[in-house]
């Protein structure tokens, strides 16, 4: 079976078009390396009881990470709190960390 990877990217202050543009480039790199890319671009609104949207989406990303062997970190990841946590999790749980 194909190895799976997800993309960790800064999103703050970016619109959907910019986010998806960065994702497409990262996806091409990963597919070229033989990975299947797990989608972690979430657009659904959280349930009304969610009081911290960024934390909700981070939790969803971490759940998706459990399906992956690797995580690709886009440029600027080290200044984005969600990406920093994803990098710590990927490292702690033995996933391959790929830096742009």
Locations of the language-model features?
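Conserved catalytic or regulatory cores that recognize and/or transform ribose-phosphate-containing ligands
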Residues: 1-100
């Amino acid at each position: 079976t194909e190895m799976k990877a997800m993309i960790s990217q800064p999103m703050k202050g970016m619109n959907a078009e910019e986010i998806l543009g960065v994702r497409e480039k990262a996806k091409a790199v990963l597919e070229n390396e033989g990975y299947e890319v797990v989608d972690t671009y979430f657009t659904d609104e959280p349930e009304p009881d969610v009081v911290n949207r960024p934390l909700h989406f981070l939790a969803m990303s971490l759940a998706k990470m459990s399906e992956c062997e690797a995580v690709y970190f886009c440029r600027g990841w080290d200044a984005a709190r969600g990406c920093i946590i994803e990098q710590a999790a990927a490292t702690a749980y033995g996933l391959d960390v790929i830096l742009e």
